Amino acid sequence: MAPKTKSRLVDQPPSASSSEEQELVEESQEEEEQQSREEEGEEESGEETEEDEEPKTAHPVVKKPISQKLVQTPQKPQFSSESGSENGSGSDSEAESGNSLPSPSASDFTVKPNVAAKAATPSKPAAKRPQEAQKEKGKKKPKIAEEEEKKSPATPRSLWSDDDQLALLKGILEYKTVKGMEPSADMSAFHEFIRGKLQAEVSKSQISDKVRRLKKKFLTNVKDGEEPVFKKGQDFLIFEHSKRIWGAPGISNGGVKDNVNNTSNGKAKKTVEVKKSSEPKKSAKVSKPKDDEKQKEEEQQVAVKEVVKEDIVKGDQQDFQSKYPRLAASLETMSGLSTMYPNGSSLLKENMSLIATDKAKVLEEKWKKLEDDEAALMVKRLDFIAEHYRLVVDAMRGN
């Protein structure tokens, strides 16, 4: 009875193994079809993730260990012929199972994900917008307007121009000659007198302050007893008119120059000469270029002074003729003077302004009286001529 039980055990495994292999083949085919379908679905969609693919690949269940156990069962020796035949059939089944296709393993059916792991690229900083870049450039640029505001404000323009200063000095001289009094005695009258001759609108206080400063400037210039050197002709004109108003240096202001010249013992001159003689010769050699430059400057100053003096003379002549028109016209009536003295009329015209103002006034009044007398005489003469002609006409008519 024992051999029969053994033969049953040997006969059962081949049938079981063949059915299992067939099931495995069918499952493998189904899995291949399913895999192909999944690949087609992935190609169509292209958006499936790794999480969706992992459960699908976990379906195949391989029951390979059962066949391995059947193959690896030890064969016991059979003592009967039946056992030998059975053994032969068992060996045949084993041979058939050996010749059959190997059962697929679970690793053969695992689907590897095709999705490549993207390398984490470092995020680049976003490019700045053009508006932000322009704003930053605008911040970096220096603000010229702010720098200009920080600068110190421009100096205010001077109220008194050189022409107005000169006109003020001329007005003082004219006012003194016409009114015979100082402008400071009646500033209201002088303000009305001078305001039409100035370009700027000034008040009485501004005029008095300017006169005071001009006088102070003149006295400072003549303090050393020497005439200062001017770079502009206008400054020299102002100085000359100031001299005519407030006096020459050394006369009314006690200049050093006149005091030195008037000294009886001449000590001041000697001290100056001693200083000059005590200077070393080397310093004299070194100072030659300076002396040349100084000499050139003095020559230029002399030329400027001559030109300015000519302008002063011309200006004085025009002012004199405007103040005393009868004196100027009197030269034209002196026709006989040119025959007696050819250069007499031109000489009088050039030097007429040198006459003192009080004497010029007297001459002007005399010429005016003479013109009035001449006019009255002309009327008498015309009346006499008319009477003479009337008598002649009446005589011719026989009356």
Swiss-Prot record:
Any Pfam family matching the protein: GeBP-like_DBD
Region feature (Disordered): 1-160, 250-301
Compositionally biased spans, kind Acidic residues: 20-54
Biased composition range(s): Basic and acidic residues: 143-152, 270-299
GO cellular component: nucleus
Keywords of this entry: Nucleus, Transcription, Transcription regulation
InterPro entries named among the record's database cross-references: GEBP, GeBP-like_DBD
Primary subcellular site in the record, as a coarse category: nucleus
Segments of skewed composition (Low complexity): 80-100, 116-125
Reported function: May act as a transcriptional regulator. Binds specifically to the B-box motif, a promoter element that is required for the tuber-specific and sucrose inducible expression of the patatin gene.
Protein known as: STOREKEEPER protein
Native source species: Solanum tuberosum
